[in-house]
A protein has these predicted regions:
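Conserved phosphate-binding/catalytic region of the ribokinase-like
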Residues: 162, 166-270
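Residues that scaffold the ATP/ADP-binding catalytic core of kinase and kinase-like folds
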Residues: 65, 158-159, 250
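Conserved beta-alpha-beta core of the PfkB/ribokinase-like small-molecule kinase fold
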Residues: 90, 94-171, 193
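Structural alpha-helical scaffold elements that stabilize or flank donor/cofactor-binding regions
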Residues: 83-84, 140-141, 178
Length: 270
């Protein structure tokens, strides 16, 4: 939802695809989406609406306790979803939503249904939470994406799982980029900056120093701003710069979906 919300702030027609339960929490989510004017394809299923307990450590970094056997583990592939896939230019998917075979199958069918078109983005934003990932799921997602978003901690875990050599994080990124024929690989390193790798080039941006309210949603806003910029035809350095600025702003706000300042929203029209 965070990614779709921020993409919509840059003028794109976005949709959240998921499932909620036939319960009060499901009603609340639908109401929040209405308030945010966030378009969606949320199926109501006979499972409880998903919940996550989020606590912040002393540095403001979120820790997650994600409940299992919930609605978003059971997203059905509907005719409406098939129609959406056929008209989608960019999609962002993660590893957490694939922990159950039902939603995993739906995500893969959606990716396979998307028609090949110039400039299309299939963004795999890895989110390694608790024990909700496997080597098999990660490998299949690497194969189906053309943009990989990963942070430095996740890169170390992936490197151990897949046996990628080398100490330097950049070396590992080049290996992933080449092995899976990616258009782009985005590596975020917290306060140590971020990188965007493309075949033969790398962009680096420092992380701005800002007063942090919390970091929930900052990574999603980074991905959304970057991909929106690329879809608008901006260069990789331009897209990277805006992504860093948007993410920094979100860190100064409480909650994952603040309204972005007009100056940031209008940058893609320059």
């Amino acid at each position: 939802a965070n990614f779709a919300y921020h993409v919509s702030q840059f003028g794109f027609d976005s949709r959240v695809v998921s499932a909620v339960g036939n319960d009060e929490l499901g009603d609340e989510i639908l109401e929040i989406f209405r308030e945010k004017q966030l378009k969606h394809q949320l199926e109501r299923v006979n499972y409880p609406t998903g919940t996550v307990q989020v606590t912040l450590d002393n540095g403001g970094v979120p820790c997650y306790d994600i409940k299992e056997g919930v609605a978003w583990d059971n997203i059905p592939f509907t005719d409406d979803l098939k129609r959406l896939a056929l008209s989608t230019r960019a999609v962002c998917f993660g590893s957490l939503a694939q922990r159950d075979e039902v939603s995993r199958a739906t995500i893969n069918r959606f990716l396979d249904t998307m028609p090949d078109m110039e400039g299309q983005l299939k963004i795999f934003d890895i989110n390694l939470r608790q024990n909700f990932y496997t080597k098999e799921v990660l490998r299949e997602s690497f194969r189906k994406c053309n943009v990989l978003k990963i942070n430095d901690e996740e890169l170390i875990i992936i490197s151990r799982m897949f046996g990628y050599p080398g100490i330097d994080l950049q070396d590992k990124c080049w290996i992933l980029l080449a092995k899976y024929n990616l258009k782009m690989l985005i590596l975020t390193c917290g306060t140590n900056g971020s990188y965007v790798f493309t075949p033969g080039t790398v962009s680096f941006q420092e992380t701005p120093k800002v007063p942090v309210a919390d970091t929930v949603g900052a990574g999603d806003s980074f991905t959304a701003a970057f991909c929106s910029s690329v879809l608008k035809g901006k260069s990789i350095p331009e897209a990277h710069r805006l992504a860093v600025e948007v993410s920094a702003y979100v860190c100064t706000q409480s909650g994952a979906m603040p309204v972005l300042p007009e100056a940031l929203r209008n940058r893609l029209n320059d």
